[in-house]
């Protein structure tokens, strides 16, 4: 009996060692350009990049990196591959450039939101994840960390008054595949979806919808709106919008307990009305509302 117990213990220890050895922590640090710490009990290696460059205050209180101003990424073995999860601390003008780097290098962007109210300068938090080889994931995180060290990009702006809106609604409807309504100088298109909550169907009027609101002119327009997506649609919609140079301003949920789970992203775009509509149409084609 003792020999069986001893053999089992040896095999378990060997398996644990193999599992731990799969994480090349030195390589992770090299590729990410950040120092990390191994949680041996969880077999998770976490690298951190404190935002010590930010002089942030909230209601007169000075915040330092330990108060939640540290970008990080945690790596864990997942069978023959690796899983990563992380959170990036970004100024507003860094959000979309950093998001594009993450998406273009194979990471998923899973949430974008604020952690504070009334902070100065304003900061957003972008959560990322991924599953694949250690080399590809650590390299992607390293590129994200590197982009965070660079200056942000000016946020798009335009001098537009909805009172002077002159848009070609027929053109927008043709491009988007859905007709909208003009009210108060805003041409708004709403595309409903359905989900179930508490055993009942909820749809567009209950807020389960994608919408786009245009104002301005054909040559100088602004669009803002919201995409309702299943979890499996989020990444392709994000990539389509960013490739169209449309800004992502939030990614989150509006409900709990719905089936299927519905995620929402809010966006903002400035440019020619036709270009904005075509960018949105590409993103719409990544969704399958019913």
Predicted features and spans:
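Intrinsic, low-complexity N-terminal interaction/targeting segments
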Residues: 58-74, 195-216, 251
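A conserved regulatory-domain signal marking ACT and ACT-like small-molecule sensing domains
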Residues: 71-76, 87-90, 124-131, 142-143, ...
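An N-terminus-focused feature that recognizes amino-terminal "leader" regions
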Residues: 26-86, 95
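Sec-dependent N-terminal signal peptides of Gram-negative exported proteins
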Residues: 2-18
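Intrinsic disorder/low-complexity detector
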Residues: 19-55, 146-192, 196-200, 288-290
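Extended, low-hydrophobicity, polar/charged segments
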Residues: 138-140, 192, 203
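Extended intrinsically disordered, low-complexity coil regions enriched in Ser, Thr, Gly, Ala
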Residues: 64-66, 91-118, 201-207, 231-256
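Hydrophobic, ordered structural segments
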Residues: 92-110, 120-162, 269-288
